[in-house]
Amino acid sequence: MQINELVTFAADVGRGLLESGAETSRVEDTVERIIRHFYDGKSEVLVVMTGLFVTVGDVTKTVRVRRRTINPVSYTHLFL
């Protein structure tokens, strides 16, 4: 897998997780694991609620996330 493809794939997975309501720490961990599986060099991942930044080698991709959903099943215990 080429570095550009890896960065795009990892960022797309991160976007999907954030849009699905995943915690930022879980998104960051997942994206880092994907990158480490395919690339041994230096990489950086930063995830915030509204986007993520993925750098692998000299390639950086920034993704803004505008749409987020929350799975109501996971929060039902708050209302019981």
Regions from the language model: what does each represent?
Residues 37, 41, 62-75:
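Alpha-helical transmembrane segments and immediately membrane-proximal extracytoplasmic
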Residues 2, 19, 23, 73-74:
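Catalytic cores of large soluble enzymes that bind and process phosphate-bearing ligands
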Residues 76-80:
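Conserved small/polar residues in nucleotide/adenosyl-binding loops
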Residues 23-47:
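Divalent-cation
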Residues 9, 14-22:
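Short Lys/Arg-enriched alpha/beta "domain-start" segment
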Residues 1-9:
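N-terminal, Lys/Arg- and Ser/Thr-rich interaction peptides
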Residues 56-61:
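Short acidic-glycine loop/turn motifs at beta-strand connectors
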